[in-house]
Amino acid sequence: MDENLFEEELTIEALSAMGNPLEQLSALVDFEMFRPELEDILVKKDCKSTAGRPQFDVVLMFKVIFLQRYYGLGDKQIQYQIIDRTSFRQFLGIHTVDEIPDEKTVWHVKNILSKAGTFDALFDKFRSYLDGKGLSFNEGKIIDASFVEAPKQRNTREENERIKSGNGKDLWNDKPHKKCHKDTDARWTKKRGEKHYGYKLHAKADKKTKLIEKYVTTDASVHDSNVIDPLIEEKDNGQPLYLDAGYEAKDDVVRECGMIPVICEKGHRNHPLTDEQKQNNRQKSKTRCRVEHIFGFIEGAMNGSFVRSIGIVRAKAATALTCLVYNIFRYVQINKYQPQLIASMG
């Protein structure tokens, strides 16, 4: 056996003995389930020429993008890390440098999938897979939102005013190269004295599994409480919906959507919360805080919720990918720590 291959085999065995998380993931999730949706968009069915380098396998490319999002890596960084890390190459089934896509290929494929809305389709595909595993409970849902930071723009005051008024699309038409680097969809906002720029991920999760069931992406200035109805589905009817104090006074909206509001109360000037209200809030928060675990995982294990791209279309694709990657890893956690939640398919 070649000495380098022998060394790699020993490294793989050592990683496995230590509990390689990507190996555990591969054993549980068959990424081939995503092939139909990926081939639909990426395979050039009318390409008859055999010249040039053959296309990379579509599932391989998605797994590269999956790794990139989970570890919060840029296009150049993911190429380097695949070359450098045995665990990445094992997960991808790659053995030689020639099999590794370069940064331009990664960007190109991700761009095609983003524009086509493919990450939404893959999220739905995996959600159906989870439903098939019995991970669909009707005991309550939780809604919350988190900022998705975007690259900050340097504009004049007049340009910012036009963007804020919704007329930013007409700016820089005489400078197309400059315009392609300008984000006219992202917005500034302030929360608890801290400024944020970019977008916002609004998510609905199941209270029992902490799996994300639906998500909506808006600019950062949209208040959390204005995105309730788009997240609620018919199957949620009659279930309790847990919300924090930021959704105060939205009881009627929740009821109109067919759910039972369970909203933490907020004290006001000259009207502080009573001891009873504080106790009620503590009880509600025991369930509501479970959604914080989701955003905590994204911020911690996935190196934050952010976009490196320009515009709402790519931001929506990025949040769809984030939610999909989170759900896949959450499914692995459930298998490991809460296997009783998974219904027997036998």
What are these regions (language model features)?
Residues 30, 52-60, 98-102, 283, ...:
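Secondary-structure capping and boundary motifs in well-ordered enzyme cores
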Residues 1-39, 334-346:
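Charged, often Cys/His-bearing segments associated with DNA-binding zinc-finger transcription factors
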Residues 23-66:
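Basic, short loop/linker segments at the boundary and entry of helix-turn-helix/winged-helix-like folds
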Residues 89-107, 261-263, 269-276:
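Phosphate-backbone recognition surface of nucleic-acid-processing proteins
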Residues 80-83, 93, 101-255:
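Polybasic low-complexity intrinsically disordered regions
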Residues 152, 318-323, 327, 333-346:
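C-terminal domain-tail junction helix/linker
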Residues 164-166, 240, 245-320:
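Helix-centered, glycine/charged polyanion-binding patches within enzymatic domains
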Residues 58-69, 84, 230, 296:
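Contiguous, well-ordered alpha-helical segments that form the cores/surfaces of helical PPI scaffolds
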